[in-house]
From Swiss-Prot:
Protein name: Translational regulator CsrA
Keyword RNA-binding: yes
Places the protein is found: Cytoplasm
MF annotations from Gene Ontology: mRNA 5'-UTR binding
InterPro entries listed in its UniProt record: CsrA, CsrA_sf
Record's GO cellular component terms: cytosol
Biological-process GO terms, alphabetical: mRNA catabolic process; negative regulation of translational initiation; positive regulation of translational initiation; regulation of carbohydrate metabolic process
Pfam families hit by this protein: CsrA (PF02599)
UniProt KW keywords: Activator, Cytoplasm, Repressor, RNA-binding, Translation regulation
HAMAP family associated with the record: CsrA
The organism's place on the tree of life at top rank: Bacteria
Organism: Xanthomonas campestris pv. campestris (strain B100)
Length: 70
């Protein structure tokens, strides 16, 4: 596993198409923003595991900016 240190506002690249930006840090929570093409699926791990198990239907679209408050 690659481990990186980033500050708020700093970004890392995954390949040529995906960027991950640190949006904020509060206590032990880190908010990140991910910019990826629509054909690249981005899920929280627990949601991804549900999808893999077929436990429950998951909305087909990702929610962007669903919680922009700090």
């Amino acid at each position: 596993m690659l481990i990186l240190t980033r500050r708020v506002g700093e970004t890392l690249m995954i390949g040529d198409l995906v960027t991950v930006t640190v949006i904020g840090v509060k206590g032990n929570q880190v908010r990140i923003g991910i910019a990826a093409p629509k054909h690249v699926a981005v899920h929280r791990e627990e949601i991804y595991q549900r999808i893999q198990r077929g436990d429950e239907p998951v909305a087909s679209g990702a929610h962007h900016n669903d919680d922009c408050s700090d």
